[in-house]
Amino acid sequence: VVTTHKPAPRHPRMCAGVAGRAARALTTAVSALALAIGVLTLAPASAHADDAVPSQEYFSYYHLDAARQKGYTGKGVTIAFIGGPVDTSDPALSGANITDKSRCTIQDGPKGLRHSTDMAIILVSPYTGVAPDATLYSYQTRSNDTQSTGTCDTGGEALDSMGKLINQAVEDGAQIITVSMAVPDTSDELKWAVANAISHGVIIINSAGNSARDENSTQLARWSGVIGVSAINSDGTFASYSSWGNGVVTAAFGGPFNTINPDTGASATARGTSISAALVAGMLTLARQKWPNATPNQILQLLVHTALNPNHDWNQQTGYGPIDGGALVNTDPSQYPDENPIIDKPGGSSPTAKEIQDFT
């Protein structure tokens, strides 16, 4: 997430084409893990600086007030968030259903703690969360802001490896796993953890990165079946900071997001594909609530068939197109085949369909 100097948030512009349709959406090896959080400058205090819980532009962009009025709140769905510790004392998370399911505990720095807390806010905040009634399980893993690995290194074994945490989330009953950090791990442990998640119908989401380049080789989205998410601006254009690659499946609003500078406590705004990934995870949570009888494969088919690129054509920047949250809850996925549409990614990916079948 890149924190930048921005004025108070405005209502998103409702442009024609892709941006207009998106804005109308909900009305009709572990040590290599790197969490990219760059603070550039402080933002001025916004109109909501004195409020305990600031407003968020994505809430109006995706018309989440209308979603809540229709009963789309994620009730009955469990999300797993893999990242740093979450500060559940944050006012925006008051009343949220969050359980720390970590296999061990780390000591994170202020940037990492703020980042993870912001992701939880996007997912399940009763005030500005996409899926306020969903259950959130959090799993701690180290990042480049980690100050101590705490209890996570035991006898030479890393208890917080991405593969172990994905397997743990699957075992704990999560239906959606979201990861807003780079994961350059290419181990067999992670490969088979992804296969395990797919075979159990668990959907995995991963941010594309914020380096404005092809980051496919350093992202979890390089693996078969994982939804890579890039960022768009509020006018629907591809965000200049967003990374891309063969693992990208969709895109979503990447900011501004109203947050707090972790070093000073001052109001700040942030942008990044971490925000986009959390929004996609939240909207897929609403789809799983709305369509409980659909298979996870059909939910994935729904995502790619309703994404907003013309004819849903795929490209490295936005995948099949920006997510259309409205279509996810208004289009019956039972019309689509029970086949995972993102197993064989462009350029090839692992595990293969046969490996997943053999694993099962």
Give a label for each model feature:
Residues 218-289:
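Extracellular S/T/G-rich loop segment that most often corresponds to the catalytic His/Ser-adjacent loop
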Residues 291-360:
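C-terminal subdomain of the subtilisin-like protease fold in secreted/lumenal serine endopeptidases
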Residues 145-221:
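Substrate-binding/access-modulating region of protease and related hydrolase catalytic domains
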Residues 78-83, 135-140, 170, 175-180, ...:
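Structural recognition of the beta-strand scaffold that forms the well-ordered cores
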Residues 68-79, 85-99, 107-155, 224, ...:
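Subtilisin-like serine protease catalytic core
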Residues 52-78, 103-108, 324:
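N-terminal domain-start motif of subtilase-like serine proteases
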Residues 1-49:
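Secretory targeting and sorting signals
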